[in-house]
Design a protein with these regions (language model features):
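Short, positively charged and aromatic/hydrophobic N-terminal segments
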Residues: 3, 12-16
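Active-site-proximal alpha-helix that buttresses catalytic centers in soluble enzyme cores
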Residues: 15-289
């Protein structure tokens, strides 16, 4: 049985569902050798999912931290676990999801049968989930409550270089979807390292209010230090460490600028991870309203 909580205008929240006693969940994150906060969202989402008792086991692994993707090959030794759902906690399809993760986890396709007979099932990354648009809008509303949307420009920030082109494409796709809703005065995709540049926000926007949401999984150095600096947010206006919200409203250039933490820090991403696994299994448990 699936239990959902309906939230008017905000979709449905997965509360519980029948356990999959013969299945495990592996959440794959990027991680960082210099910023431990990079892995925090993945670990927190794993703990949330584990507490719900849906899967027999829930584990995480990382490209740049321990446990590594190679370490994960030795997880899930319980012979009762017949299926392992692998969900990349990445914002878009790209080099890591198409090349690095399959190579390191020795995946041969959508389904890979191990010598033990255990089947590893490679799911779509969280950023490709249909509810990303809803999550972006919710985050924008949460950091700028009561602000008139028709007097507001919404900026979706991605990295945006040739090395990370798919994240730029994903941001642009989300912007197009939000534009079609005709809620904000303007909706723009901006980037750290290619035009249109987030640092040029004053010239790109004309409204008295500007809301900025980083389209990133975690509050790493980009979303916590680099982007605020590019926006011109004074040092010291941020909280003491990554993973904690910045002071949301900043008065800059005669405007009200609202800056969010990275989208993937939202606790509701745990539901997205579950849904990506369940979608592979053919079970629909999360619907956006």
């Amino acid at each position: 049985m699936v239990i959902l909580e309906f939230r008017p205008g905000r979709g449905t929240l997965l509360l519980s569902m029948d356990p999959m006693d013969n299945a495990a969940l592996l959440i794959v994150g990027h991680g960082s050798t210099v910023n431990p906060a990079s892995s925090t969202p993945t670990l927190l989402h794993a703990a949330t999912i584990r507490s719900r008792g849906i899967f027999a086991e829930v584990a995480s692994c990382f490209w740049k931290e321990e446990p590594s993707l190679r370490d994960a090959l030795f997880f899930f030794r319980d012979p009762g676990i017949r299926d392992v759902y692998v969900v990349p906690n990445f914002i878009s399809e790209g080099y890591f999801t198409r090349t690095v993760i399959p190579r390191e986890l020795e995946l041969t396709g959508a389904e890979t049968e191990r010598a033990s007979g255990q089947v590893w099932k490679y799911c779509a990354p969280v950023g490709s989930h249909e509810t990303m648009t809803t999550h972006l809008l919710e985050r924008a509303r949460e950091i700028a409550p009561g602000v008139t949307e028709k007097e507001t420009t919404l900026l979706i920030v991605a990295h945006g270089t040739s090395l990370n082109d798919n994240s730029a494409v994903a941001a642009k796709e989300q912007v197009e979807k939000i534009r079609q809703l005709d809620r904000y005065a303007a909706v723009l995709n901006v980037y750290m390292e290619e035009p249109p540049l987030v640092s040029d926000w004053v010239n790109l926007t004309k409204t008295p209010n500007v809301v900025v949401v980083p389209f990133f999984i975690s509050d790493g150095l980009h979303s916590y230090e680099d982007i605020p600096a590019l926006l011109g947010i004074p040092e010291g206006r941020a909280s003491a460490r990554p993973g904690h919200a910045l002071s949301a409203e900043h008065k800059l250039h005669g405007r009200s600028l609202f800056y969010s933490t990275a989208l993937g820090t939202d606790s509701r991403f745990a539901d997205v991870i579950i849904e990506q696994a369940m979608a592979f299994a053919g079970k629909q448990v999360f619907q956006s309203a």
